Each structure stands twice: as C-alpha cells, then as structure tokens.
Regions:
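Catalytic core of nucleotide-sugar-dependent glycosyltransferases
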Residues: 1-153
Length: 153
C-alpha cells in the first residue's frame, strides 16, 4: 500500500458529510459488465435509498457511459427513473464519478459498505480501513481473494 493517497475533493467531502450510510461501488478500471447488470445494479441502489437502507451511493464508473445502461429504470413501486439524470449527478443521494479517491472514501466513517470486484488493492485498502465488503469477482485473482475475504468473517 502507498504511503500517500489523494484526499476527498471538496464536492466529495460535502457529499460524505450529508450522507451517514454510504455505499461505495467500484469494480476497478479494467472490468465491466452487461447493460442488463449495470441497470439492475443502479435500480437496486435507487431502491435501497428509497427504502432507507442506505442514504448515499458513490459509484466510480471509470470506463462506463450512458450507453452502458438502459435509459429508464422501472422501480418496484411502479415509478420510472431516467438513468441519464442519475449519471449526470442530478440524484441528490447518488454521486457518479470517473476517478474516486478510493482510500479516502473507504477511510471516511460514513462509508458503511464497499461493493467491489475484489482486486488485491481494493481488498487491502478495505481491510486496512475496516470497511465491510461485498465482493463480485469478475476474473483472475478476484475469485480467490473473495474466498479469502469470506474466510476472515
């Protein structure tokens, strides 16, 4: 692990202060999933906020674009949400960013869960900061990392 990490930007710090139960989502810069999975995940995040399970989401979307999501999310209560409004950071409780100061986010007391691909760097940072993880491995060492992390529980 590095000795120095980028700090939270003022915008990110303001978001973190306004939200006491933040879910941080990051799958690294080299992994992506399907339009269906991206849209289902985004819908699930909105539903979790609406049900007051969490009150904020930071999602680091390094290589994704609007084309990686369905244009509309159909929520379980029958309402529809335009994906573009979320991806343009118009949702007050979801912050989408290209680059995340990950260690600073994980080290913030309001970050309650890290949804990750389980890469070595992410796993080490999460363990160091004591942030709980939900791991969705995509390839290579991530499957083994997920098993090792699970054995620590």
């Amino acid at each position: 692990m590095s000795e120095e990490y980028p700090p939270l930007t003022s915008e990110m710090s303001d978001f973190m202060v306004r939200h006491e139960r933040v879910l941080y989502v990051a799958f690294g810069g080299r992994f992506s999933t399907t339009i269906e999975n991206n849209s289902k995940l985004l819908q699930s995040l909105v539903e979790a906020i609406n049900k007051n399970i969490i009150d904020g989401v930071i999602w680091s979307l390094v290589q994704s674009s609007k084309d990686d999501f369905f244009p509309t999310l159909n929520l379980t209560d029958g309402t529809q949400v335009q994906t573009s409004s979320i991806l343009n950071n118009e949702h007050p409780h979801i912050h989408i960013i290209k680059f995340a100061p990950q260690f600073a986010i994980l080290n913030h007391t309001n970050t309650k869960l890290f949804f990750s691909h389980g890469g070595a760097g992410s796993s080490h940072e999460s363990m160091y900061t004591g942030t709980s993880m939900l791991v969705l491995p995509f390839s290579s060492d991530q499957f083994g990392n997920a098993e090792k992390l699970n054995s620590l529980v």
